[in-house]
A protein has these predicted regions:
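Non-catalytic surface loops within mature trypsin-like serine protease
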Residues: 30, 46, 75-77, 90-92, ...
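Accessory beta-strand-rich segments of carbohydrate-active enzymes
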Residues: 1-81, 109
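Surface beta-strand/loop "capping" patches
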Residues: 78-108
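Outer-membrane beta-barrel proteins
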Residues: 14, 59, 90-92, 139-141
Length: 211
């Protein structure tokens, strides 16, 4: 829905408005009854307005209302890891392999350990005790070989994992280069939520099957 108001134990916890079908997160610590039962209420409103898409006009996507995705509760440490932003600085590429440095930005300012493993095999390929992680001869991600790695950031009381692919992507006029080689982008239009049995509440496994 276009707008959602969240209440915890009848206490207003926050609002998500004018942002369309995007995920959001709220801190509900002050409204929680620890050690007791809690009640979460989400009021979804799909009323159109001039202040947000589709601006009271025509549109070509499903306009279902309601709660269309999961609502989850996260228990976090006060100084826990909220996010991990990873930038790949590639120094060299040869024969489908790359060497360089992973530069990580996060909200925590405390000692940490970073581990990088092959996503399919679980084999550890590099690690560091800082947010700068040198790597050597990691497999490049490409359309034909979508190699992935799992980056794990760990502190004394929290852990966060992110999947990444090592690649370069740039445009040169009308040309698009992936890993230094020109590619031709092809695709098709698929609108999530268009299935008559599910609408915008289409299950993830069904979406994956369609893809």
């Amino acid at each position: 829905s276009y707008t959602a108001k969240v209440y915890v134990n009848d206490i207003f916890a926050g609002e998500h408005s004018r942002s369309g079908y995007t995920p959001f997160r709220l801190d509900i610590t002050s409204a929680v009854n620890f050690g007791a039962e809690n009640r979460i209420r989400v009021e979804a409103d799909n009323t159109k307005a001039d202040t947000m898409l589709p601006h009271n006009g025509d549109f070509d996507w499903a306009d279902d209302g309601g709660i269309t995705r999961r609502v989850t509760l996260e228990i976090r440490e006060p100084d826990g890891i909220e996010y991990m932003h990873i930038t790949e600085q590639i120094d060299s590429m040869q024969n489908g392999l790359a060497s360089g440095t992973l530069i990580i930005k996060t909200n925590v300012d405390k000692p940490c350990k970073v581990t990088v493993c092959d996503y399919m095999t679980g084999e550890k390929v590099c690690e560091s005790s800082s947010l700068t992680v040198p790597f050597k001869n990691l497999k490049l991600w490409s359309c034909c070989s979508p190699n992935l790695y799992l980056v794990t950031l760990k502190t004394d009381n929290d852990i966060l994992e992110e999947r990444i692919g090592i690649r370069t992507f740039e445009t040169k006029g009308e040309r698009v280069d992936l890993n230094g080689e020109e590619i031709y982008l092809k695709g098709c239009e698929w609108m999530p939520g268009s299935h008559p049995d599910f609408g915008m509440a289409e299950p993830l496994d069904h979406s994956i099957k369609c893809l």
